[in-house]
Amino acid sequence: GDVYGGGSPTVIAFYENGIMEDRFGGYVISCEPARNVLFGYHPKTAGAGITLPQRDIFLTSNPEKNFAGADFARAGKINGLINLFRPSDVCIGPDGAIYVADWFDARVGGHGTRDMGQTGAIYRIAPKETKLSIPRVSINTIAGQIEALQNPSPNVRELGRSRLEKA
């Protein structure tokens, strides 16, 4: 794992293939809302386990690390959207893009929810000039099920895998 001090990691996604640059192949993306960041890792095998030898900043609204609204940053003050980027979920879409759910809450940790409007955003991360499309896959045939196994989205791959298992 990765020990970096106070925070509130919420979810990870494994980016295997898709439309992003090759350097993101095999990349683990971790949401950290208290630190306003998505961390990225290239896991390495170590015997029967794995290590995360280097932490990258994949995406952040707060490069100056002016943390506020987290249990470990009691003195910090919310500074607009810099501190309100709270990535709470990440997944890989069937189009190969990375999708990030962001919750605009002034507080993270404990039970101090302050977002009475329940506001947020979903961001799609993809190279600028990429034309995004969702491939049509028929999971009703064995050929389609095998094709689904090659999709960047683990959800689509699971559909193909579960149907193949029943075949």
Protein language model features and the residues they cover:
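Beta-propeller domains with acidic blade repeats across secreted/periplasmic ectodomains
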Residues: 1-145, 155-166
